[in-house]
Structures are given as C-alpha cells and as structure tokens.
Amino acid sequence: MSENIQLPNHTFPTTQGEVNLAELTNEWLVLYFYPKDSTPGCTTQAVGFSCLKDQFDALNCQILGVSRDSVKAHQNFTEKQSLTIDLISDKEEILCKHFDVIKEKNMYGKQVMGIERSTFIFHNQQLVKSYRKVKAAGHAEQVLQDLKALQVAS
C-alpha cells in the first residue's frame, strides 16, 4: 500500500444528518467518491453499494458515498433510486482534496476539473486498500469480495 491517508477529524453534512469520519465506530469503512448524483455511472455505483448494504453491514462495514453535490441533491438522488447508503456532501471539496480525487477530465471536448471515481477501504481508521479510476459497473461487488479477503487476512 503506497498511500497513507488518514481520516480527517471534520464533520460533514450527509443525507442522514452529519458524520465525522475520525469518530466512526465501525471496524471497517468503505468511502467511495463519485462525480455527480443522478448520472448513469454514479447511479450504477450507488445502487450497487445499496443492493449489497446488508452484506457490508454483516461484515461490520459502513459505506459512505462522497460527491460535491448538495445535501438536497443527495436526498433527491437517494429518494429517486431508493438508496440505503449515506451520502456525504463535500461542496467545499475538503474530502476530495484530502483524498486527491479532483483530477483534470475531458468532458465534451473541454478540460474540466472533476472527481475521479475512487474508493478507499479503512480498517480501524487505517487505509488498507484504495482503488483509483474505478469503473462503476461491478465495482461494489469487487469491493465486497476484497473486503471479505481483507477480513480473513487481518
């Protein structure tokens, strides 16, 4: 593992209230970053994690999605897609910058700065696995499989 990222001691607004990542009590955490609510790839990813939430819960693992969208946009996305996971609003890009997920992207022929789809697994507040340049389809299943393997190894 070449990345050494700590969870920041900062409170963020979420669809279910607020969360301070440094104060989470779950043994395991999946923190995934996605570009924008209600877009095809992001919907695929969020629905994938939501469908597997019970399996992650059984492994004492919390799932949190992060984007720059507002809490209201997250709530609309959650309601429309019947999501069961909590989403963090990072409008000020505090988490995005902390995890270095803001990258230059080509969108409709223009260079823009946006979130590079990325996921991080933490065990007892320590980063144990990271995924960069994630493909949305099948990603939640891969993370669940990797989490099970990490738990066997720990």
Give the ranges of each region predicted by the language model.
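Chalcogenol-based redox active-site neighborhoods
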Residues: 1-154
